[in-house]
Amino acid sequence: MLRSLVGSEMCIRDRITAEALWAGVRACKPGTTTWEINRVVHETITSRGATPSFLGLYGFPAAACISVNEELIHGIPDKKHLIKEGDIVSIDVGACIGGYHGDSAYTVGVGEIAPETKQLLEVTQECLNRGIAAALKGNRLGDIGSAVQTYAESYGYGVVREYVGHGVGRKMHEDPEVPNYGHPGRGVRLMPGMTIAIEPMINLKGEGVYTPVSYTHLRAHETPEHL
């Protein structure tokens, strides 16, 4: 988003979004359906006086996108889809209050997961950390994308290019696009007050698409503020 948001409004929307996300993560257990996780997310958002941002967005039928294993993103919750031991589940949540949207996601391993999958989750989290660290006033979007791409590829992983991060504010998806690849010093310059979602989407090359997605919001100041 290319304009500044009011600080208190951002704090409220991001707190509600985070509460709903972690409620969904806690509900993610073997034998639980993806629809039940969605129900928990929906109830958490509405109980805080907010509206689920995803419900009805582009026709989406639920409050949370829940993607399991090889599903990339935007998975639709299903009353028949049971979570199993060893699954990895990405839960993506959006909440709107006071006219402002929040957007956050987390990928959780259910019970014991394969060592290579655990490493993928850890590397993706570090990709996010490095992307946040690059979100400094005066840097450019290419600095963020390069930080994510360089770390992922150092492990031989692939970066998904079909989907990118984005600005977020009055609308769920705003300019600028925030790719997970790029070259330092290129792209839109980061300015104080910008609010963006950094969304690393990383996969195991040649072994199916396991794509943990971690989102954050930040404001580009002298140092980034992780909301």
Question: What are these model-predicted stretches?
Answer:
Residues 15-105:
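Extended, compositionally biased flexible segments
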Residues 41, 148, 216:
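Aromatic/hydrophobic pocket-lining residues that form π-stacking "cages" and hydrophobic walls in ligand
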Residues 1-7, 12, 217-220, 224-227:
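Single conserved hydrophobic/aromatic residue that forms the stacking wall/gate
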Residues 8-9, 13-47, 109-137, 153, ...:
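Flexible, acidic/His-enriched mid-domain "rim/lid" segments that flank
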Residues 1, 50-51, 56, 72, ...:
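Glycine-rich, flexible loop/turn motifs
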Residues 93-95, 112, 125, 148, ...:
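Short, structured patches in soluble enzyme cores that scaffold and shape functional sites
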Residues 133, 140-195, 201:
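A contiguous pocket-lining binding segment that forms or flanks enzyme active sites
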Residues 68-100, 176-215, 219:
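Acidic/histidine-enriched ion/cofactor-binding microenvironments in catalytic or ligand-binding pockets
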